[in-house]
Amino acid sequence: FPTRRSSDLPTWGDKVDKQWGKGPEIFTPENAYKYGKWLGERYMNAPNLIWVIGGDRSGDGKNFAIWNALATGIKSVDKNHLMTYHPHGEHSSSFWFHNASWLDFNMCQSGHAQQDFAIYQRLLLPDLNKEPHKPCMDGEPRYENIPINFKKENGRFGDDDIRHTLYQSMFSGACGYTYGCNDIWQMFDTGREPKCDADTPWYQSMDKQGA
C-alpha cells in the first residue's frame, strides 16, 4: 500500500489576507520567516508530512513576500519534506512561485464554477510544460454537493462531476488528485449554520457516490 501522508497547513489564509475569512491579519515577512523556521525545527523529523503554504489565497501583491518568507523559513531547516502552495480559485502556484526553490510541485485550484476540460487547459497543462519541470496537481477541484458557482439555482456538482475532474486531471498528467465534499469540509450537521448551502450531515456524506 502507498505511504499515507498528511498535508500540513502552517496557517489559515485569512491570517495573511483576510478576504472572506475572519482574520485578523497577523503576519509580516519578518514574523512569517521566524514562525516558519520554528515549524521547520519542530517537525523536520516528522514522518509522512507535506507542507502546503497558502490556504486558498493569492500569492500576489503584499501576500507574496509573506508567503515566500514563511516557506523559506520552513525550508531553511527542514530539508526532509515536500512543499507546495494552495492558491485561490482558478489559479496555480506557478503564477507566483514556480521558480521558488522551496516549491517542489505545483498545485492549481480548478474551483467550483467550471464544468469542462477548459479549466485544465488553462491551469494544469501549462504548468506541466513550464521549466524547470515540476509535477502538478489540482488541490481543490469541484466539491461533491456544492452548488455550481455557489448558486443553488445552478444545481449541484454530483458524483459524475467528481469523476470528470479525476479523469481530466489525471489523464492530463497530474501527479495526484484531491476529493472534496461540501458537507464534509465544514463538518456540517443538523443544528449548525450551513456554509455554501450544505444540506447533508457530514457523516452521511461520507457515503456519497463520489467519495
Model-derived features: where do they sit?
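Short, structured coil segments at secondary-structure junctions
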Residues: 99-102, 132, 172-173
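Active-site clefts of carbohydrate-active enzymes
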Residues: 57, 90, 94, 103-105, ...
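Aromatic- and carboxylate-lined catalytic core of secreted/periplasmic carbohydrate-active enzymes
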Residues: 135, 144-146, 160-211
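Active-site mouth of glycoside hydrolases
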Residues: 4-105, 109-117
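Short, flexible/disordered intra-domain loops and linkers
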Residues: 19-21, 61, 149-159, 189-198
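A structural signal for short, well-ordered beta-strand segments and their strand-loop junctions
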Residues: 52, 84, 138, 178-181
